[in-house]
């Protein structure tokens, strides 16, 4: 794909949404003393950082989404991948069902290969509820979901079990009833 420059300032969005909902836990513990001070006979706690778990990126591939829209979505995803550091990213392509599930990171391909190795699937109607249904059925434990769509969902924004960010393409009238929404232009 010939990617475009991402419109969304993902660094800013990361501060607002992703780090609030997806941040790992940083804490200190004496169970692993800081070795720098042990030679001086002092015991201080060492810092422990837990990484962000799985992030789901759900991409609308219904009939209203063409190659131009997919390229824009992938450009924005590349921007998000460059500034986040989840342990894994799960990409779900959906129309009325989840048509493809790709895992990048710990269990799959390297995250930095996502945009170049992904294979979009779908092209039917639109039912966003299939994404959360799939997440529940597969018992996917993600810290957040980012949904890329044109927002033509027939008024059904679904119910979600984890923090949600909508990236809505060229549809300022789309007003999700759940989660946080940002509008992007083609």
Across the structure, where does each feature detected by a protein language model lie?
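Acidic, polar low-complexity linker/tail segments
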Residues: 1-56, 65-68
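Composition- and surface-driven signal marking solvent-exposed, interaction-prone regions
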Residues: 15, 70-72, 158-162
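Von Willebrand factor
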Residues: 50-108, 130-149, 153, 166-169
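VWA/integrin I-like adhesion module and closely mimicked acidic/polar interface patches used
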Residues: 152-186
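Short, solvent-exposed polar/charged micro-motifs at secondary-structure junctions
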Residues: 37-40, 100-103, 156, 176
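Acidic, Ser/Thr-rich peripheral helices and adjacent loops at domain boundaries
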Residues: 101-128, 182-186
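A conditional alpha-helix N-cap/helix-loop micro-motif detector
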Residues: 7, 70, 124-128
